[in-house]
């Protein structure tokens, strides 16, 4: 039987430096008999030569479009918004299963071309637990940025400036500690932070960043399902300086915060980091903004407030790219056992479940989306 060919595409999302495959996992796949083609990429945190040394074949950027149909296309974030049908099996995050804006157009490209989406967000084991996720580093980066925005707001009237990725965690934390020191000098105290979803991967990452930045336990309110069971909005959020939302959303729940709950004279809340960033989802429990932010413009102000301090929202949907090397290594390591079964993915439980979900979602597409 011919070896299975994996084609790692270059990411097109602005400032996305992460990679679903790393040189380390590429070497393991090649050792197991796979052929790995890697598109050259000026953005990827790993140099092209690192993949070449691991045994991969370097191919031109965007060459996946013309790759043989049987090649499996591996990527990370969503494809560019184009209209041509997709013929391959694609392994990636597509962000089209939770009725996000434009989901029909994104999803319909696969059945229109005879292709298949195996969405990384929904790869689960037999217990329904995700086999690999960027949650920890998303929470870590989100909480780190939230601390920097809090300090910035106290000392500047203009919006928080753009940020770039860091070579490692130590460099990020050094910057955050410096910012917190400046914030404390202005506020006269350390910030109080509430993290909702604190027991999961994302929330534990957020709490880890807060502690490494010098925020003591007594200033961190770490909530999970038990604490939110009574239903919001929650005064504890507006009493905190920073709110980091780390919940994984699958259905509508009572709002954690809304415009009405923010209109209180004693509001302390200055920064919301919505790590979940389900900005356009009808399920969002943080319906106080409608704009997805970027590393170029990390915050969006909450308009319409009549009292209290300014309030900024961070809603970057690829926060782990702030720490691209560490985030990629951790994710790809966790994904590797599943990647090693791609040569028989139809009969591998993890991939078969992803295919079943794809089929279910395709069945909900309006006929008009399939006719383009």
Curated annotation (Swiss-Prot):
Active site feature: 77, 95
Pathway: Amino-acid biosynthesis; L-lysine biosynthesis via AAA pathway; L-lysine from L-alpha-aminoadipate (fungal route): step 3/3
First-tier enzyme category under EC: oxidoreductase
Record field: catalytic activity: L-saccharopine + NAD(+) + H2O = L-lysine + 2-oxoglutarate + NADH + H(+)
Residues holding NAD(+): 129, 200-201, 224, 228, 248, 275, 316-319
Residues given in the record as L-saccharopine binding sites: 18, 77, 100, 130, 134, 276-278
Lineage: superkingdom: Eukaryota
Pfam name, any one: AlaDh_PNT_N
Coiled coil: none
GO biological process, one term: lysine biosynthetic process via aminoadipic acid
Keyword field contains Oxidoreductase: yes
Enzyme Commission number, as recorded: 1.5.1.7
Gene Ontology cellular component terms for the protein in this record: cytoplasm
SMART domains given in the database record: AlaDh_PNT_C (SM01002), AlaDh_PNT_N (SM01003)
Sorted UniProt keywords: Amino-acid biosynthesis, Disulfide bond, Lysine biosynthesis, NAD, Oxidoreductase
Subunit structure: Monomer.
Biological role stated in the UniProt entry: Catalyzes the NAD(+)-dependent cleavage of saccharopine to L-lysine and 2-oxoglutarate, the final step in the alpha-aminoadipate (AAA) pathway for lysin biosynthesis.
Entry protein name: Saccharopine dehydrogenase [NAD(+), L-lysine-forming]
Organism of origin: Neurospora crassa (strain ATCC 24698 / 74-OR23-1A / CBS 708.71 / DSM 1257 / FGSC 987)
Higher taxonomy: Eukaryota, Fungi, Dikarya, Ascomycota, Pezizomycotina
Gene of this entry: lys-4
């Amino acid at each position: 039987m011919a070896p299975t060919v994996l084609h790692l595409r270059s990411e097109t999302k602005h400032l996305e430096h992460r990679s679903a495959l790393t040189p380390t996992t590429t070497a393991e796949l090649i050792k197991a008999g796979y052929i790995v083609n890697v598109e050259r990429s000026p953005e990827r945190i790993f140099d092209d030569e690192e993949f070449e040394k691991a045994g991969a074949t370097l191919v031109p950027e965007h060459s996946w479009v013309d790759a043989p149909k049987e090649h499996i296309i591996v990527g990370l974030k969503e494809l560019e918004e184009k209209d041509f049908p997709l013929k391959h099996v694609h392994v990636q995050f597509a962000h089209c299963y939770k009725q996000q804006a434009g989901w029909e157009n994104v999803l319909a490209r696969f059945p229109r071309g005879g292709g298949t989406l195996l969405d990384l967000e929904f790869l689960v084991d037999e217990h329904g637990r995700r086999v690999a996720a960027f949650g920890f580093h998303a929470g870590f980066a989100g909480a780190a940025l939230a601390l920097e925005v809090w300090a910035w707001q106290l000392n500047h009237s203009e919006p928080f400036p753009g940020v770039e990725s860091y070579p490692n965690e130590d460099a990020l934390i050094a910057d955050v500690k410096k910012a917190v020191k400046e914030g404390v000098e202005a506020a006269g105290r350390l910030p109080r932070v509430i993290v909702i979803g604190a027991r999961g991967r994302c929330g534990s990452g957020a709490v880890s960043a807060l502690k490494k930045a010098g925020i003591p336990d007594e200033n961190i309110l770490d909530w999970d399902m038990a604490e939110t069971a009574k239903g919001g909005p929650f005064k504890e959020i507006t009493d905190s300086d920073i709110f980091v939302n780390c919940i994984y959303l699958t259905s509508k729940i009572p709002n954690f915060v809304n415009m009405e709950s923010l209109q209180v004279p004693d509001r302390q809340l200055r920064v919301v980091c919505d790590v979940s960033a389900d900005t356009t989802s009808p399920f969002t429990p943080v319906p106080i903004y409608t704009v997805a932010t970027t590393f170029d413009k990390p915050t969006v102000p909450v308009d319409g407030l009549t009292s209290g301090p300014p309030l900024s929202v961070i809603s970057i949907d690829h926060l782990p790219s702030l720490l691209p090397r560490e985030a990629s290594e951790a994710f790809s390591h966790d994904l590797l056992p599943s990647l090693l079964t791609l040569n028989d993915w139809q009969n591998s439980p993890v991939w078969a479940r992803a295919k079943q979900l794809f089929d279910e979602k395709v069945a909900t597409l309006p006929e008009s989306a399939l006719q383009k």
